[in-house]
Amino acid sequence: MALRFLGIDPNTGDQGSPTVWLDDETGDLVIQSYKADAATLAACAEVGSVPGHSTDVPEHETVVRLPGYMLQFFPKP
C-alpha cells in the first residue's frame, strides 16, 4: 500500500486530528476522523441509502464524521 498524505485539520492539536491520505495504488481515500456518535448513527439509519439496502452498519465498516472544511484536501476529479 502506497499512501500519500493529503492534509490534516489545520486546527490540529496533539490529540489526533482529522487526516486524509490517498492510496496511490487504488485511488481510495483513507480517512482518520471523529467516531460518529449515537445520534449521527441513528440519523444515518433514518435517512437510509438506496432502496433494498440495509441501514445497519456492517461489522467490517464504520461511520466517521469529517469536518466539511477537510474537503479542501480531497483530490479534484
Regions of interest found by a model, annotated:
Residues D14-D56:
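A short, structured beta-strand/loop element
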Residues A42-P77:
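Helix-rich interaction surfaces within compact, conserved domain-sized segments
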